[in-house]
């Protein structure tokens, strides 16, 4: 398996099935801003609600091979082996990436257990060997990786964009970011000491960038302490 993240924004993705497994796939695709099409005679209440709200397209019938045409990615998420096989064949003929529930050997890709912290995306995969173990590891990450990591990721991204435009060497830029990561900034953010974190950013980047303006533009502003 080759680890990769896919940009599915606006791409047509097909889910065949209407139960709990299909529901999980649809939720993940919507989180990735994909254009989701669903084919199933029946839907779970949650999926039906999404269809009625217009968030997904729903064909209320059995799957036919033509459904695969134009799809970038396809999930076969039914409990019927013959349907799963039919979806697999149609996806392969259409040149789409395909994932077949409970058939890891037939899949072009596996869906990892995912932890999202805004723009920060962490995933755990076991190559299909044990989704349950992946879920346990994800839960452990969720306990250890708090919202302060997402805050730091936003901050670093906001600094990186203007810094890349400056006539500095690659090693010099890397050293600046390393000064950030080698500090206690994560702990400061975790403790609500945002003013201390902002002061450190100013100390590292203030001679190069308009740090105050950059910080004020972030959703985490104002950079004042939130804990006494």
Task: Please name every model-derived segment.
Residues 1-50, 228:
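Hydrophobic, well-ordered beta-alpha structural blocks that scaffold small-molecule cofactor pockets
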Residues 20-21, 81-82, 128:
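Residue-level detector of alpha-helix initiation sites
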Residues 36, 58, 97-98:
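Hydrophobic beta-strand scaffold residues
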Residues 40, 58-62, 102:
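Short loop/edge segments at beta-strand edges and connector loops
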Residues 51-69:
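Glycine-rich, highly charged phosphate/nucleotide-binding loops
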Residues 73-80, 84-111:
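ADP-ribose/adenylate-binding Rossmann-like module
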Residues 100-150:
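E1/E1-like adenylate-forming module used to activate ubiquitin-like modifiers
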Residues 128-228:
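An accessory alpha-helical subdomain
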